[in-house]
């Protein structure tokens, strides 16, 4: 499962390539790059799923949780830090298959549906960013990474909804979607900070439940 990092890196590099150099590419070239990259991501997702579900299980018959990649981004204390990595469990592995497969179908369909549209290359760049954001969300090793990629999902959704930026209706819809979700995201962020403060970590399991004490409500 050493290649799982490519599941995130490939669409990210596709986003950079199409976003920066897309204007010098033909529609066919840009669409082919985006689609082939997602094809590779889909294959890697299925390979990862096969390897994961073929691996030995725990004594109680459950699947183990694997973290093939994880590094500390911003350290605060010994246990409290922002990490970026990849966590594999049955849910995240199945979601890799769902996201990559659906995204590949969207890329293939868009190749003909968006044919001749102005900004075709930009559209495929946004699709790559959207896919990378969703993939990063489901394999997050901690709640802060989940929040980070959730915000990227919101940004890429805003860009895709407002793709036809010359149409007032598209601009209005993109702004509405972006602003409304930001209110909920603020609550999400506050909850994460409270969790980190009282739990001593941004991981999905507090360092010690015995030390997880909440203030008394009077």
For each feature predicted by the language model, list its residue ranges:
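...captures the hydrophobic TM-helix bundle architecture rather than a specific catalytic motif
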Residues: 1-212, 218
């Amino acid at each position: 499962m050493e290649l799982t990092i490519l599941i995130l890196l490939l669409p990210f590099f596709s986003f950079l390539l199409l976003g920066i150099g897309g204007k010098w590419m033909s529609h066919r070239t840009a669409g082919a790059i985006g689609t082939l990259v997602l094809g590779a991501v889909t294959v890697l997702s299925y390979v990862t799923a096969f390897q994961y579900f073929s691996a030995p299980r725990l004594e109680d018959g459950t699947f183990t949780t694997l973290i093939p990649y994880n590094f500390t981004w911003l350290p605060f204390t010994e246990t409290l830090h922002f990490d970026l990595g990849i966590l594999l469990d049955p849910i995240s592995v199945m979601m890799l298959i769902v996201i990559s497969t659906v995204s590949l179908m969207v890329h293939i369909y868009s190749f003909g549906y968006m044919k001749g549209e102005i900004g075709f290359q930009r559209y495929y760049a946004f699709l790559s960013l959207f896919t990378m954001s969703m993939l990063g969300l489901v394999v997050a090793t901690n709640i802060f990474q989940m929040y980070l990629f959730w915000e990227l999902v919101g940004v890429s959704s805003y860009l895709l909804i407002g793709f036809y930026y010359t149409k007032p209706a598209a601009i209005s819809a993109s702004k509405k979607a972006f602003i409304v979700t930001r209110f909920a995201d603020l609550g999400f962020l506050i909850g994460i900070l409270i969790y980190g403060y009282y739990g001593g970590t941004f991981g999905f399991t507090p360092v010690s439940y015995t030390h997880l004490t909440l203030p008394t409500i009077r």
